Structures are given as C-alpha cells and as structure tokens.
UniProtKB/Swiss-Prot annotation:
<keyword id="KW-0413">Isomerase</keyword>
<dbReference type="GO" id="GO:0005634">
    <property type="term" value="C:nucleus"/>
</dbReference>
<dbReference type="InterPro" id="IPR005251">
    <property type="entry name" value="IF-M1Pi"/>
</dbReference>
<dbReference type="GO" id="GO:0046523">
    <property type="term" value="F:S-methyl-5-thioribose-1-phosphate isomerase activity"/>
</dbReference>
<keyword id="KW-0028">Amino-acid biosynthesis</keyword>
<feature type="active site" description="Proton donor">
    <location>
        <position position="254"/>
    </location>
</feature>
<keyword id="KW-0486">Methionine biosynthesis</keyword>
<dbReference type="InterPro" id="IPR000649">
    <property type="entry name" value="IF-2B-related"/>
</dbReference>
<dbReference type="InterPro" id="IPR011559">
    <property type="entry name" value="Initiation_fac_2B_a/b/d"/>
</dbReference>
<protein>
    <recommendedName>
        <fullName>Methylthioribose-1-phosphate isomerase 1</fullName>
        <ecNumber>5.3.1.23</ecNumber>
    </recommendedName>
</protein>
<comment type="function">
    <text>Catalyzes the interconversion of methylthioribose-1-phosphate (MTR-1-P) into methylthioribulose-1-phosphate (MTRu-1-P).</text>
</comment>
<comment type="similarity">
    <text>Belongs to the eIF-2B alpha/beta/delta subunits family. MtnA subfamily.</text>
</comment>
<keyword id="KW-0539">Nucleus</keyword>
<comment type="pathway">
    <text>Amino-acid biosynthesis; L-methionine biosynthesis via salvage pathway; L-methionine from S-methyl-5-thio-alpha-D-ribose 1-phosphate: step 1/6.</text>
</comment>
<dbReference type="InterPro" id="IPR037171">
    <property type="entry name" value="NagB/RpiA_transferase-like"/>
</dbReference>
<dbReference type="InterPro" id="IPR042529">
    <property type="entry name" value="IF_2B-like_C"/>
</dbReference>
<dbReference type="Pfam" id="PF01008">
    <property type="entry name" value="IF-2B"/>
</dbReference>
Length: 372
C-alpha cells in the first residue's frame, strides 16, 4: 500500500498560473524555491540542474510553458495577443526548452506530445488556448504521479518474488525519488515500497560524483522518512558486493533504447558490471515515458558532457581542488550506457515488468510502448 505523500519532499509547487521549483543544488542545507515565470526561467533551471531527474524535468517543463504563456498573455504587447500568436509562442517554447538537456528522453517526448496536442486544440481566444495548454500540462503532471505508484507496486512485487527473501538489501545510485519525479520516485520509489511493506533490510546509496545526488538528495529523502540506509562512495560498490549480502541493484534511467540499453547517471554501468560479477540481480525502474523505441541501442544516444569545473572544484564551496597545468585534460560525461545484457533483473515500468530474454536481443521495449 502506498503511503500518503511526504510534503517535505515536494520539489514542484504548482497551482494554475504559478510554478515554483525547489533548487536542488542547495539541498540538504537550504530549502529554496525559485519562481518560474518565463521560458528562459525553466530553460535555465533545467540546464543548471536546479530541477533534475528525467521525469521531474519533463513535468516541470510542461507546466512552466503553460505558466509562461499565461504571463505573456497579460502583456499588452506580448507574443500571446492572438490565437495564432499564442499557438506560435507555445510551439516555439517547446522547441526552446527541449534543448536544455539532450540525454533524458522524457523531456523531448513530453514536449513533442505537448506540441502535437497544442496544434490540435481548437480555441476561439488566446486565453482559451493558454487554458487548454494548462489542462494538457496538468494531465502530464497527474500521469507522472500515477506512473510512480505503478512502478512502486510492480517493482516491489517483482524484486521480492525474484529474490525470495523476507527482507532485501539494495544498492542504488543518484537520486530517483520524490525529488526527481512528481511524487514518490522510480528506483527509489521501489525501495520506498519495500520499506513501507516491511521488506527492506538496508539501502546502500552511492554518493554519485560529481554532483553528489546520492549523498545530498537520496540520503535527504531517506532521513526524512526514516528509511534504513548506508552511504557509500561510488568506488566501494565492488567491495560491498564482495563482503556483504546484497540482494539487488535498482537504478533509474534517463533513456532506455529499443534493445534495453540504458542511459543513466555516470557510474551506473560500473554498478552493473560489478553486479554481474557477483551474481546480484540488476533492475532498471522507469516510467514508459523513458522508453525510446526510436533509438535502436546505446551507441545512438547523445551523452551530455558538463563543465570541467564540476571535477576541478568543490561543488559546495566552489574552491578549486585540482592543480592547474597545460597537460591537464578533463572528461566529464554525465551519463553512461549500461548494456541490456547486464540488466539481469528486468525493466520495471508502471505497466509491468519487462524480463530479459536468455539471448540477444535481451529486450524489446516495443512490447510496452509500440514501435513509435
């Protein structure tokens, strides 16, 4: 049974016409909500990782575009002074926001859907079109909450059935909980459900360098709900699996290709390789909006690379901690690709669980989302 939502973990505050997003860069020490008024505001919030997590990015983008259009409508000389102008503003806003982060497919899929639906809306006034956009965005928001609940339910049942233990110990990476989604989470949502059902022994949270989403955000969520956890550095996962009873690795995803190859936070593939070596089932938990049947495999995924200072500086103090010199080279990919062959436990979605085949191709996600 899903528990009531913990409002402390709310990262999206929305009411028709207003949107405030939790600046997750400042957690766990400060709780600061930024008001989102314009398209530039949401593009910057996504790009600068004030809002993060593939589902949360997509939902926030849709809501923000509706809010931005409403604010534009209030201007006498704004872009939304006619039905045609409003439609053009909404469609162009979707295109702009889509460029903020390239790897997470939820953002592009959600905004492509919003564009299609806006193009189909029949409205007699600019205000009517803005209201229709708000209704569409609110539907996307509500759907993500339902997706969270389905993933939790299917995931907890599948993990306990496969592991066959009364209590399980789990490793996860990054933050895939309420802060990364609209409500409960994906991979951390499954962990939550195991905890709610009294079936969680311990969750081991990887710190997740360089942004430390595991240390800052996953630990924050576990503390808020008294979930039993242990924080580990990313490089400790093999030692952990080799020395303590670990029953499952559960991770989220930013894009799952047609064959099951999974783009997720850098370090996920390391986890999968270690899990395969030690015989630990490896699960991916994500909503169907993360499934990308148009991308055949991981080789086709564009991997975002971020600023070098994320590695050369302490992210909290902004103090440089790496020596400078002409021979210094830095590579800072945000995501890696976990081959489908290493997703041994299955892909958990709100619609059920895709279990791997014994031979390649190990998955065919079109069984859930169709070919396009």
């Amino acid at each position: 049974m899903t528990r009531a939502h913990n409002a402390t973990l709310e990262s999206i505050q929305y009411a028709r016409g207003t949107l405030r997003l939790l600046d997750q860069r400042k957690l766990p020490f400060e709780t600061v909500f930024d008001e989102i008024l314009t398209v530039d505001d949401i593009w910057t919030a996504i790009k600068e990782m004030r809002v993060r997590g593939a589902p949360a990015i997509a939902v926030s983008a849709a809501l923000a575009i509706a809010v931005a259009a409403g604010n534009e409508l209030k201007k006498n000389d704004g872009a939304c002074n006619s039905v045609d102008g409003t439609r053009r503003f909404l469609l162009e806003s979707c295109d702009t926001v889509m460029t903020a982060r390239p790897t997470a497919v939820n953002l592009s899929k959600t905004l492509i859907r919003l564009k299609r639906d806006i193009a189909d809306v029949t409205a007699n006034t600019a205000g009517g079109l803005v209201e229709a956009c708000a209704v569409l965005a609110e539907k996307i928001y509500a759907e993500d909450v339902a997706y969270n609940e389905g993933i939790m339910r299917h995931g907890a049942a599948h993990v306990t059935q496969l592991v066959k233990k009364s209590k399980v110990s789990v490793i996860t990476i990054c933050n895939t909980g309420a802060l990364a989604t609209s409500r409960y989470g994906t991979a951390l949502g499954v962990v939550r459900q195991l905890f709610y059902e009294g079936k969680l022994e311990q969750v081991y949270a990887c710190e997740t360098r360089p942004w430390n989403q595991g240390a800052r955000l996953t630990v924050y969520e576990c503390v808020q709900e008294n979930i039993p956890f242990t924080l580990i550095c990313d490089s400790a996962v093999s030692a952990l699996m080799g020395s303590r009873p670990i029953d499952a690795v559960i991770v989220g995803a930013d894009r799952i290709c047609r064959n099951g190859d999974t783009a997720n936070k850098i370090g996920t593939c390391n986890l999968a390789v270690a899990a395969a070596h030690y015989g630990v089932p490896f699960f991916v938990a994500a909503p169907s909006t993360t499934l990308d049947p148009m991308t055949a495999d991981g080789e086709s995924v564009v991997i975002e690379e971020r600023e070098t200072m994320e590695l050369t500086h302490n992210m909290a103090t902004q103090q440089r901690v790496v020596a400078e010199g002409p021979s210094l080279r830095i590579w800072n990919p945000v995501f890696d690709i976990t081959p489908a062959a290493l997703v041994t436990g299955g892909i958990i979605t709100e619609r059920g669980v895709l279990q791997p085949s014994a031979t390649a191709p190990f998955f065919d996600i079109t069984r859930i989302v169709g070919a396009s």
